[in-house]
């Protein structure tokens, strides 16, 4: 076990201990009548982790909630970053903002308490001290979470092993518990604006194709431990010398990643926003990424993609791979037991060539 893995386990354990302590301290949920879906008119979803990919995948849940409760208002507590994704979801009525900090969530809870929500949803694996305090202040009619038998503030719960099931299965289980019937659409959903399409089109018109293919690379993940190295991508460009490589990302982060390297002749950067970059990736022959947000985006838009994950080829999948792996056939998953920056260039080239063929 690496130090980083040990540290993550330690932090998860401490988080669980704080949550269990808070559950005992904060007491039970207010007395409520038996759950009745016909009485649900106001829903609040906690999505303040600020993760873009999680917000995108939440489109499955939000669409299902709107189908189950067509006249209800569905509000979301979000972070400043993932609001970019949630804001254009047609099922969302209003966004409210909070960090994962205790003070921020309590302040948000006090603000929203007067709305008297009928249904509160927190689908994280375990609640935190801050999220429990938020729930205590909010006092919704019904509050749902998985495996919350030891947390009396939740008056709706069901048991599920969240470490081995895909995130869409988690959302489906929640919706079924709440009363959803019939076939559930588990595809991801995102809307791309016309202005994004125009911006990407203008950029594409400036490229000198020369008969080659377009390979779009998102080299940077949320963590440096999951990002590609410049050496890898420059190495790939030499394997495919007749193709054009477009590097996606924020300008300052790409500059730091390049570390003074000059771009190769058939290599350019594209530093516009998420939606413009998504349109550009749609036009590519293949997208290469180590980042789960871009994997979810590729699934939503059916982009031909090679997604590099940390993990081992084993079945059944467990942990991060089990929960967040791509299910869309357009996305091929490459598993590597170490950090993504250590994947050999020849291995990346082989999988890219398979997709390009």
Segments predicted by a language model, with ranges:
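Catalytic machinery of carbohydrate-active enzymes
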Residues: 1-357
